[in-house]
């Protein structure tokens, strides 16, 4: 995965954590259910993730653990 994608994902993960949620659980819910509500609006994370390639986000989550 490219550096820009990794940087954006780090920002999204940080925003989810700052909102008080488990980033892995929220991202897993996003990729399995396809619902953007799993991603917080904090830090503009929801808008950022919508601009990313869904398959890359899915791979990111699959490689998390």
Question: Where in this protein do the model-derived segments appear?
Answer:
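Intrinsically disordered, low-complexity, basic-enriched segments
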Residues: 1-65
